[in-house]
Amino acid sequence: MNKFEFNLENFDGPLDLLLSLVKDKKADLFTIDLADLATQYLEIINHLEDSNVDVASEYLVMAATLIHIKAKMLLLNPEEEDEEIKEDKEMLLKQLIEYQQFKEVAKKLRQQESIRSEIFIKDPSNYDEYYRETDETLLDGRSNSLSLMNTLRKMFERVHAENLRQTKIEAVHVNPEQRIKEIRDLFDEFGEEVDFAKIFNVPTITHFVITFLVLLDLARKQEIKLIQDKEFGEIRIIKIKGVENEQ
């Protein structure tokens, strides 16, 4: 990959870029030389054009994390490994594995969306009556699963990007049934509208994927709707009135 022709728009965040670099090396996540991977990542970031600075904010957070890990690795005896470095490396590896799983879920959703697109639906007799301009970047309560996934993912990355270095992520064991109950409890506690941060309150991809699938299921059952009034605006998760929780 030529770093001078590199374009961040081809990637969905720093973890996506790191996975691409691992793939280019034809290496396994568990055996990749992290110092070498960090060097290549940092070379790319250092050659970003000025016009990409705003886009690259989350990439710079990851760059700071990699610099921290690489600096400690270089200072230590190759035969030794500091416990903190080991934890940092394990956390980064865990994030990469979780993100890889997330991409697989996204791929399956795209396949389902493709199958759904092949189903023919007769146009209304008077099309103009039903036409309205839409902004595909926003959520209007009727968005398809891919739009919802992409919008929630971007919101998730934005909320947690600045905490990548500071947060020590512990194992979180959660299942869909548990998350459904927790989300319904949030509505009981806070009323008919719950903000994004309260529902996506654990910064792990696994927690995000399970919560995302639960929200899809609740939206399908018409228990909730998701509204975003403007691009990059706060996502509002609203309970639909008159719907009783299933016990």
From Swiss-Prot:
User: Where is this protein chiefly located?
Assistant: cytoplasm
Query: In which compartments does the protein localize?
Result: Cytoplasm
What GO biological process terms are annotated to this protein in UniProt? cell division; chromosome segregation; DNA replication
**Gene3D superfamilies referenced in this protein's UniProt entry, alphabetically:** 6.10.250.2410, Structural maintenance of chromosome 1. Chain E
Q: InterPro entries annotated for this entry?
A: ScpA (IPR003768), ScpA-like_C (IPR023093)
Q: Name one Pfam family in it.
A: SMC_ScpA
Keyword list (alphabetical) reads: Cell cycle, Cell division, Chromosome partition, Cytoplasm
Which residues are listed as membrane-spanning? none
Q: Extract one GO cellular component term from the record.
A: cytoplasm
Subunit organization: Component of a cohesin-like complex composed of ScpA, ScpB and the Smc homodimer, in which ScpA and ScpB bind to the head domain of Smc. The presence of the three proteins is required for the association of the complex with DNA.
Q: What does this protein do?
A: Participates in chromosomal partition during cell division. May act via the formation of a condensin-like complex containing Smc and ScpB that pull DNA away from mid-cell into both cell halves.
Q: Which family does it belong to?
A: Belongs to the ScpA family.
Family annotation (NCBIfam families) = PRK00104.1-3
Q: Which PANTHER family match?
A: SEGREGATION AND CONDENSATION PROTEIN A
Q: What protein name is recorded for this chain?
A: Segregation and condensation protein A
Organism field: Mycoplasma mobile (strain ATCC 43663 / 163K / NCTC 11711) (Mesomycoplasma mobile)
